[in-house]
């Protein structure tokens, strides 16, 4: 939005106020300057639903990190358009929801996915190699609540085969980007990024 200032602050309350107390104390400033605000407790685990298709490396990494307590989240379900990882997910005691997605039933499939999200009380959806482009309607309904991990240093090399694109362009760095999902493919606000350097060593396209 134009003519808006956005700010995110992390702080610790030495007096131990509750979130409700902080909201009440902050409200006069909100009214005075016509601000929009939200308070979140960093210690509270976010309820998350993962979405995956047929590549399991992201899913397995998230499940492992969640299992050892390395992620401050509560995985309340996994949604997939395939059955490949049902046993893996249910072995962790997590509900697995198989919803087949085709061009013909995409609207109905997304409506079913949204019902699962609402019923589970999930605050976030994480796309762990979910190989379907979400509709504009779903992106709008879940604005700011869907996270994608794209395997390039955005805004470079959007879309499919980003490593191949990077290799053909001859770049010396490749990266990964976590971003919020919007209706524009790989264009959402960036959350975090990381990079690694690459060499001139021969690389097989099968690994890109």
PLM segments and residue spans:
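Short, glycine/polar-rich helix-capping loops at beta-to-alpha or helix-loop-helix junctions
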Residues: 81-87, 134-135
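A short alpha->loop->secondary-structure connector
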Residues: 66-75
